[in-house]
Amino acid sequence: MAFELPPLPYAHDALQPHISKETLEYHHDKHHNTYVVNLNNLVPGTEFEGKTLEEIVKSSSGGIFNNAAQVWNHTFYWNCLSPNGGGQPTGALADAINAAFGSFDKFKEEFTKTSVGTFGSGWGWLVKKADGSLALASTIGAGCPLTSGDTPLLTCDVWEHAYYIDYRNLRPKYVEAFWNLVNWAFVAEQFEGKTFKA
């Protein structure tokens, strides 16, 4: 069965002024879609045929991994954003962030540093470790926390195609704008154990 490009969970212009309609048209409709097309061209006739996207990400390498992980990462990223996002988390997630980082502001500062400081194209992540603790991670290229057994809670895409139309080379400005869109309800669902399937 072929993989399909999931629709955005909001309209292309819904994240303005922080992320433009043009960026989403390129980022989702072209870049994300290209990974889907590539994956569908690579999988037939391999051991990965018939496997879920998550299974492929956890067990593949090379071109199949790169495209599968990028499909998964992007679908997860779109869900981390919302036109009604921003603000701060509440409840158990907020408590866990405070316990791990000292305060929400300190977490925000550290996550921003992790994302901005990712060398080249990659992703900044908040993850839940197997012992339930929270940690930050930076992955290069198509890197995905699923491969290390961590549970992704939040990601910021810092590939240049995520921000270049709107912010050019100013990655810090893009990450600053990202905070206005974070979908804390989605992040909380992941923290509480809801399994995300891309």
Curated annotation (Swiss-Prot):
Q: Which GO terms describe its molecular function?
A: metal ion binding; superoxide dismutase activity
Q: Which cofactor does it need?
A: Fe cation
Output the Pfam families linked to this UniProt entry.
Sod_Fe_C, Sod_Fe_N
Q: Does the record's keyword annotation contain Oxidoreductase?
A: yes
Q: Which PROSITE patterns match?
A: SOD_MN
Q: Which annotated residues bind Fe cation? A: H27, H74, D157, H161
Is Metal-binding among this UniProt entry's keywords?
yes
- The EC code for this enzyme is 1.15.1.1
Taxonomic superkingdom: Bacteria
As its record notes, the protein acts as a catalyst of: 2 superoxide + 2 H(+) = H2O2 + O2
What SUPFAM superfamilies does the record point to? Fe,Mn superoxide dismutase (SOD), C-terminal domain, Fe,Mn superoxide dismutase (SOD), N-terminal domain
What does the Swiss-Prot or TrEMBL cofactor note state? Answer: Binds 1 Fe cation per subunit.
Write the record's keywords in alphabetical order, separated by commas. Iron, Metal-binding, Oxidoreductase
InterPro entries, A to Z: Mn/Fe_SOD, Mn/Fe_SOD_BS, Mn/Fe_SOD_C, Mn/Fe_SOD_N, Mn/Fe_SOD_N_sf, SOD_C_sf
EC class of the enzyme, as a word: oxidoreductase
Subunit architecture: Homodimer.
Family in the record: Belongs to the iron/manganese superoxide dismutase family.
Q: What does this protein do?
A: Destroys superoxide anion radicals which are normally produced within the cells and which are toxic to biological systems.
Which protein, by its recorded name, is this?
A: Superoxide dismutase [Fe]
Q: What is the source species? A: Pseudomonas putida (strain ATCC 47054 / DSM 6125 / CFBP 8728 / NCIMB 11950 / KT2440)
Cite the source lineage.
Bacteria, Pseudomonadati, Pseudomonadota, Gammaproteobacteria, Pseudomonadales
Source gene?
Answer: sodB
